[in-house]
């Protein structure tokens, strides 16, 4: 594993005043597919303003956990609470409107729409549901919010371009902008730097650090250097369970974690 960054580069979780209670909490979260237990009694808390990373070998349960939290999969047992409210088993659209947004491992945009339209539709769905046939200019501040989301991810100058014309790195950042437009409490990023060049990865790392000033972020990522440089805390999944949890420096020196990674 790479050397952890200094505390100066950490997210501002500790500076958000008294609001440090958990935004997300899972209690005994379990999911089974036939005889396979993909998640086994996961108890996890993510504090407000925190950047939490989930790492682990392939098949460890990382994506399954993401899919449970965002409503793609319904858990077999256990609970998921967002800001103390039970959202267990709710469909993705309701979970999104409750305050959880996500990006996907595979780029998920509307390629034949403009960059602004991609983000505007997301902002509109958060405020008014999927009322696509109403003229969007009747939605007051929707465009303003969409433009603010584009500015946050560095794409304001490309608002009128087709999304298909963006580079791969820009398309991944557009996905983050789409998520931001829904005004989430918790932003879930599923391998946000997958397929990126080193320069694009660095740009995305800086972007995540910027937007973390106002958000709680949950990230699944295989790039250990990126994880160690961004995360406040890391949860290590293995065989559907949490093997270890702690700040980056602690995880880097954890003998059980090192053993798992050396075996893979």
Task: Name the predicted role of every residue range.
Residues 2-264:
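Glycine-rich phosphate-binding loops of nucleotide-dependent enzymes
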């Amino acid at each position: 594993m790479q050397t952890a960054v200094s505390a100066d580069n950490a997210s501002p979780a500790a500076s958000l005043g008294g609001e440090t209670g958990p935004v997300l909490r899972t209690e005994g979260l379990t999911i089974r597919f036939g005889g396979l237990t993909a998640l086994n009694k996961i108890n996890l808390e993510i504090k407000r303003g925190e950047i939490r990373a989930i790492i682990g070998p392939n098949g460890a349960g990382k994506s399954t956990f993401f899919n449970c939290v965002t409503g793609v999969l319904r858990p077999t047992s256990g609970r998921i609470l967002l800001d103390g409210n039970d959202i267990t088993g709710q469909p993705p659209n309701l979970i999104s409107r409750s305050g959880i947004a996500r990006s996907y491992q595979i780029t998920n945009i509307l390629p034949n729409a403009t960059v602004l339209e991609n983000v505007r539709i997301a902002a509109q769905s958060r405020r008014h549901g999927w009322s696509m046939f109403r003229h969007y200019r009747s939605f007051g501040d929707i465009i303003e919010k969409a433009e603010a989301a584009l500015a946050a991810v560095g794409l304001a100058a490309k608002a009128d371009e087709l999304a298909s014309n963006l580079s791969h790195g820009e398309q991944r950042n557009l996905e983050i902008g789409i998520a931001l437009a829904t005004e989430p409490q918790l932003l879930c990023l599923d391998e946000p730097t997958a397929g990126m060049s080193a320069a694009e990865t660095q740009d995305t790392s800086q972007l995540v650090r910027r937007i973390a000033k106002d958000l709680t972020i949950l990230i699944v990522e295989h790039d250990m250097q990126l994880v160690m440089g961004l995360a406040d805390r890391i949860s290590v999944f293995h065989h559907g369970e949490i093997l270890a949890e702690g700040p980056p420096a602690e995880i880097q020196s954890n003998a059980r974690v090192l053993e798992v990674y050396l075996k893979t």
